[in-house]
């Protein structure tokens, strides 16, 4: 009789995805981030669920309820710190996962890649609405500034903003609906993750040399299940260290002050993981232009597969393209730094140069160098 895990309708799905999945034998630790993102999502949903049991989404009590969680709920401080810093680890893993995809040409699995970009946008939306919930100064003003960007949409902009706010300013209606969204979106993300995996398993994983690996596949379990487990231990250790020793390292001090519509903080800025996009938004001295640049900074990932010109898949054997990739990484770091700086000389011009370079690398330089490298190979 065949094994139950191979015949049972439900277990068969899990078996084909986690046990008997044929996997390239040479995938490196850069392939660990998919499972780490799954772990992040599960940990965020669990800690978030317990926080939601004690949180109240009303402007008069939201800030106090978060303080109550940290002071009076059993291990509430720990749950909150894990949830807040878990978001940072989520984005660290996301950026490394995307960087891996760009470096090794994984984006040529177009459906998987595009669902991945949609997942990225969903996680960004989730993090944004979540940041509003503690109802501190940066929560309130961040919500005001970012939702206000929609007023740049021609003709319907103002109506759109008031519709999202549920009134004429960020108020109780806004907080209540943002809590509803923040509870809902992670489950949408989980659903989209299933699709992401479904499409990935149609083709199988890519690998560091970018060649077809059908001739050399090994079962996912035990080899990669244990490799993933090591990644889990490392990440959970790092998350625990951050949450226990430096819980407020990545937060904004302004968020310890309850929201006050009458007092604007000196520097309104998002969490560190949105700073690169915020820098691109601010580098254009026009509202609609800035909003379009902000959207494009993420959606540009969708055109990467279309602009792939090289005959080789990854950058493993392409030194010039490798240089461009690391320039992109450096550029992202510069943009992240600029996003947290005030709008004054020399930060304005640095941000504008970095923004132009960011789009040039994706849309011009990479396709050009890919084409050039093909010519060199022929020569």
Swiss-Prot record:
Cell compartment(s), UniProt: Mitochondrion inner membrane
Transmembrane segments: 33-53, 77-98, 113-133, 178-198, 226-246, 288-308, 320-340, 347-367
Record keywords: Electron transport, Heme, Iron, Membrane, Metal-binding, Mitochondrion, Mitochondrion inner membrane, Respiratory chain, Transmembrane, Transmembrane helix, Transport, Ubiquinone
Matches recorded under CDD domains: cytochrome_b_C, Cytochrome_b_N
Binding site for a ubiquinone: 201
Main location: mitochondrion
Signal peptide: none
SUPFAM superfamilies: a domain/subunit of cytochrome bc1 complex (Ubiquinol-cytochrome c reductase) (SSF81648), Transmembrane di-heme cytochromes (SSF81342)
Cofactor(s) the record lists: heme b
One record GO biological process: mitochondrial electron transport, ubiquinol to cytochrome c
PROSITE patterns cross-referenced by the UniProt entry: CYTB_CTER, CYTB_NTER
Family: Belongs to the cytochrome b family.
PANTHER family linked to this entry: CYTOCHROME B
Reported function: Component of the ubiquinol-cytochrome c reductase complex (complex III or cytochrome b-c1 complex) that is part of the mitochondrial respiratory chain. The b-c1 complex mediates electron transfer from ubiquinol to cytochrome c. Contributes to the generation of a proton gradient across the mitochondrial membrane that is then used for ATP synthesis.
Subunit structure: The cytochrome bc1 complex contains 3 respiratory subunits (MT-CYB, CYC1 and UQCRFS1), 2 core proteins (UQCRC1 and UQCRC2) and probably 6 low-molecular weight proteins.
Protein name per the record: Cytochrome b
Species the sequence originates in: Anguilla mossambica (African longfin eel)
